[in-house]
Amino acid sequence: MPYADTMLVEVERKLDAGVPLSMDDGLALYRTWDLHGLGRLARAQKERKSGKKVFYVLNRYINSTNVCFAGCTFCSFAADEFKEPQRVFRMTPDQVFAKALETGTNFNQLHIVGGHDPRQLSLDYWRPLMRRFKSELPHVQLSLFTAAEIEYMAKRHRLSFPEIVSALKEAGLDNVNGGAAEIFAEGTRSKICPNKVSAENWVAIHEELHRQGVASNATMLYGHIESLEDRVDHMIRLRESQERSPGYNAFIPLAFHPDGNELSYCGWTMGLDDIRTFAVARLMLHNFDHIKAYWMIQGLNVCQVALQFGADDMDGTHGSTDAEMIYHSAGTQSGQYVDDREFRRLIEDAGYTPIRRNSTYNEFPLDWTPSVTLSVVEGQLATGSVEGRK
């Protein structure tokens, strides 16, 4: 079937020949009026990678602190401990552990996000907690930190990137979440997150993670002051990083949310922009296996449509008592939790097969559950042995 926009024919030829798309190609894809053709092309590339599979994970999501001194202009979540102490929260390791188990143990991923908190972001805090999770919940993969937090800990402990990655891997780190990438273009990055890890160090840390066998994801924050050129440049840099040091599992487009931050004048992204971004990412990032449509960001309706535009993952259910605060502080209207049966229905209605996974895309039967003995010891939740059962 021919494309209404003949530019897509040339893009298809390049993809079929294994030729990476250029900056001009990426801009043309963003600007094409043939939305149906764009979706058809992206969908074909998705199905080359993962066929009719669409992935999701049963996970727990925890914000462990909102104390952060990075000062990003797009953030509505961070609290300054000295200027607004009434907003501050900070969980102890025991509180994090108990929160993770609040709704049981039937999950395969623990996703924790915090901030640049000097009292929490240290190896002394995290390594004992990570080892505890690995000892008592070995079926759960730890998806923790961003490159910004890893750089912060490296500076704090006077360690090189290889040394800090080695220390975290030894404690049980399975996957790094992919945040803090924002936009790599220096002119834009210097305006939205001047105190955060540089684009070069973000890439260097992720490549070191991959060299040491720790997987990661990659994100892009779009819909604020960046240009289309910035977006395509960001994708090209990620593609080149994947060529040098394979290990990125998924790319996650993150739509900017404007409520309560310095960039509120930018407003909300529109549905067509969201859908185009998923499709362009699938076509530009030929060496990324997965493009994730995170329902917490774009909402379930847009994410279901994104499955027809190159996305093949809807991220995690979260726990029924989890409370995501970063995007909810910025105005998201998404809920906090999606029952896995709802994920399966949405995926099947889009014409795909739901696949339960963990952080590194190992697949599980949909009805898989861990066998865990729970007990209460001196008022705290403790676990016994863990093994999977169908």
Locate the predicted segments by residue.
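Canonical radical SAM enzyme core domain
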Residues: 82-97, 117-169, 181-182, 197-201, ...
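Auxiliary Fe-S-binding modules of radical SAM enzymes
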Residues: 1-34, 242-390
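Non-cysteine beta-strand/loop elements that form the S-adenosyl-L-methionine
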Residues: 142-143, 165-184, 212, 245-255, ...
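Alpha-helix-loop-beta-strand connector modules within alpha/beta enzyme cores
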Residues: 120-145, 171, 197-215, 269-287, ...
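N-terminal pre-triad scaffold of radical SAM enzymes
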Residues: 37-81, 88-113, 176
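Conserved, mostly hydrophobic/aromatic
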Residues: 18, 42, 72, 112, ...
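Catalytic cores of alpha/beta
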Residues: 160-164, 225-239, 298-309
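Conserved strand-turn element in the central/C-terminal portion of the radical SAM core barrel
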Residues: 110-120, 142-154, 184-186, 193-194, ...
